[in-house]
């Protein structure tokens, strides 16, 4: 899955 600007 592509990375988003939000951290998990």
From Swiss-Prot:
Keywords: Oxidoreductase, Purine metabolism
Activity regulation behaviour: Inhibited by two structural analogs of urate, oxonate and xanthine.
GO biological process: purine nucleobase metabolic process; urate catabolic process
Summary of pH dependence: Optimum pH is 9.0.
Residues the record lists as binding urate: 7
One MF term in the entry's GO annotations: urate oxidase activity
Active site feature: 7 (charge relay system)
Recorded metabolic or biological pathway in which this protein acts: Purine metabolism; urate degradation; (S)-allantoin from urate: step 1/3
Reaction equations catalysed: urate + O2 + H2O = 5-hydroxyisourate + H2O2
Enzyme Commission number: 1.7.3.3
Subunit-level organization: Heterotetramer.
Family in the record: Belongs to the uricase family.
Role this protein plays: Catalyzes the oxidation of uric acid to 5-hydroxyisourate, which spontaneously decomposes to form allantoin.
Listed name of the protein: Uricase
